[in-house]
Amino acid sequence: MRTAEIERNTKETKIRLRLNLDGEGKGEVKTGIGFFDHMLELLKKHALIDLDVECEGDIDVDYHHTVEDVGLVFGQALNEALGERRGITRYGFASVPMDEALCETSIDLGGRPYVVFITPKKHLMVRDFEVKLLEEFFRAVSVEGRLNVHLREIDGDEAHHVCEGMFKSFARALRQAVAKDPREKGVPSSKGSI
């Protein structure tokens, strides 16, 4: 089974996360940040991963530590669950409309962390949540999960819809990239390792 369970305890956050890449979109998410919980719910549903996240963070100070640290732990769990990455599809792409918003994500699970996060909405807030924090989440996932991620807003007016489109497109692209390819007997790289 492609699963992982990670705990992280610092002075800023206490996180427990369980991940099953071959899940059904089930699990419980509790970070103390309503909008972020909503985004993680979209992630598990559209990636068809089982994901349980419990986080106690210093959200009275700021949301940054919680969002970034959950990204770090999710990335670690993803990397652990993928193991040697044998037999995976490796690449994924999705373009997702959300009302007036259109977002797309490309993913490469080739072991090289890099993030491109393009939206003119970075400076906006969704209620009390800074859109820019999502870039920090994806950067943390990329570094610890060893993946290249390009997220792009193609169109959109409403910041909430753009955030949803980004998470849904990321989830759908991740679902493709982690999928088993029955024809791939080894590691999907000409180098022989990832």
Task: Report the location of each language-model feature.
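Structural preference for solvent-exposed beta-strand-turn elements
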Residues: 1-194
